[in-house]
Swiss-Prot record:
Keyword ATP-binding: no
EC number: 2.3.1.191
Pathway info: Bacterial outer membrane biogenesis; LPS lipid A biosynthesis
Reactions accelerated catalytically: a UDP-3-O-[(3R)-3-hydroxyacyl]-alpha-D-glucosamine + a (3R)-hydroxyacyl-[ACP] = a UDP-2-N,3-O-bis[(3R)-3-hydroxyacyl]-alpha-D-glucosamine + holo-[ACP] + H(+)
Organism annotation: Synechococcus sp. (strain CC9902)
Class of enzymatic activity (EC top level): transferase
Gene3D superfamilies, sorted: Hexapeptide repeat proteins, MurE/MurF, N-terminal domain
Active site: 248
Name of the gene: lpxD
Family of this protein: Belongs to the transferase hexapeptide repeat family. LpxD subfamily.
Designated name of the protein: UDP-3-O-acylglucosamine N-acyltransferase
Quaternary structure and interacting proteins, as annotated: Homotrimer.
General function of this protein: Catalyzes the N-acylation of UDP-3-O-acylglucosamine using 3-hydroxyacyl-ACP as the acyl donor. Is involved in the biosynthesis of lipid A, a phosphorylated glycolipid that anchors the lipopolysaccharide to the outer membrane of the cell.
Superkingdom: Bacteria
């Protein structure tokens, strides 16, 4: 694809193409990082990116750049075709879709798949080998169900969903339109509910369901548990990384982002647009307000106000945590000073 042709496609996207200099108008066969790109590949750079130095050595045939004069000058002097955009990263994502279009499998049900006669599979849907679909389940139109997926009874999957190899959807699970469940993720597994008795732990039946609203994506090996009653609900457009555990009865708002190894205990509530970085833990029934952000390994107990950024365990406002961290490194010196003061006083 010619760079100029790609830019015409990007003009209709959301990345706000401002102007371009196509030069020799290279033919692009793909895309790569700035350090690894070759003459037939596209790359990009964001404003203030630490890789700016790599621009002087990149072998990329074309670049997507922010409106930053030094970057534009460098690309011009090196004779690299480029385009200036308000959001180069978004433009790069759109470009990848055009440079590497996905091949959609034919709509068919493989002979080795086991589909209950009471299940319904919508038109245009592909069911791969060794898929199991239980009674009264409904798979919407234009879905892709990869090998080894297990869909229990009474599951609903909306239009345009993709279920990757060995994903499992337990009874009563509900997926909206355009959801993606990656390999080995488990939706609707039993919540961790037990009642202590003199004879040991009594199991609490988990009769609820999990609901993924439209556009939710769940990473590999992540689990979302169903509650004893009611539902666990993930808000529309939320993105869940690999190896995330979401407990029974949790609710999240729209557009949340949960990084790898996040753990959310039962009954916790997340508002819209919440971001939890890697290994964040959220305690039982904690409440996180709209737009709040928790940095890696934060432990959230109680309530986080809307828009607040928290860090540490237990989680505290990020600015306070930074001050505490700075003081922590000085503790040995402070302890030494304190011992000297005590010795001087005792004399």
């Amino acid at each position: 694809m010619r760079f100029s042709t790609l830019l015409k496609d990007l003009q209709t996207g959301e990345a706000e193409l401002r102007w371009s200099q196509c030069g020799a108008d290279p033919i692009l066969a793909g895309a790569a990082s700035l350090e690894q790109a070759k003459g037939d590949q596209l790359s990009f750079l964001e404003k203030g990116n630490a890789l700016i130095a790599a621009l002087t050595e990149t072998g990329a045939g074309a670049l997507l750049l922010p409106d930053q004069p030094d970057l534009i000058q460098c690309a011009s002097e090196r004779g690299i075709a480029f385009a200036v955009l308000a959001n180069p990263r978004l433009a790069f994502a759109e470009a990848l879709e055009r440079l590497h279009p996905r091949l959609r499998p034919l709509a068919e049900i493989h002979p080795s798949a086991v589909v209950d006669e009471r299940a319904v599979v919508g038109p245009g849907t592909f069911i791969a080998p060794r898929v199991c679909i239980g009674a009264s389940s409904r798979i919407g139109a234009n879905c892709i169900v990869h090998p080894g997926v297990v869909i229990y009874d009474d599951v609903e999957v909306g239009e345009g969903c993709e279920l990757h190899a060995n994903a499992v959807l337990h009874p009563g699970s509900r997926l909206g339109r355009g959801c993606v469940v990656n390999s080995n993720a488990v939706i609707g597994s039993e919540g961790f509910g037990f009642v202590p008795t003199p004879r040991g732990w009594r199991k609490m039946p988990q009769t609820g369901q999990v609901v993924l609203e439209d556009g939710v994506e769940v990473g590999c090996g992540s689990t979302i548990d169903r509650p004893s009653v009611g539902e666990t609900r993930i808000g529309a457009g939320s993105k869940i990384d690999n190896l995330v555990q979401i407990g029974h009865g949790v609710t999240t708002g729209r557009g949340c982002a949960l990084a790898s190894q996040v753990g959310i205990a039962g009954g916790a509530k997340l508002g819209h647009g919440v971001i939890l970085a890697g290994q964040v833990g959220v305690a039982n029934r904690a409440v996180v307000g709209d737009g709040a952000i928790a940095s890696s390994k934060s432990g959230i107990h109680g309530e986080v106000a809307p828009g607040e950024v928290v860090s540490g365990y237990p989680a505290i406002p990020n600015r306070l945590w930074l001050r505490c961290s700075a003081a922590f490194s000085k503790l040995p010196e402070m302890a030494k000073t304190l011992r000297e003061l005590k010795r001087d006083i005792s004399q």
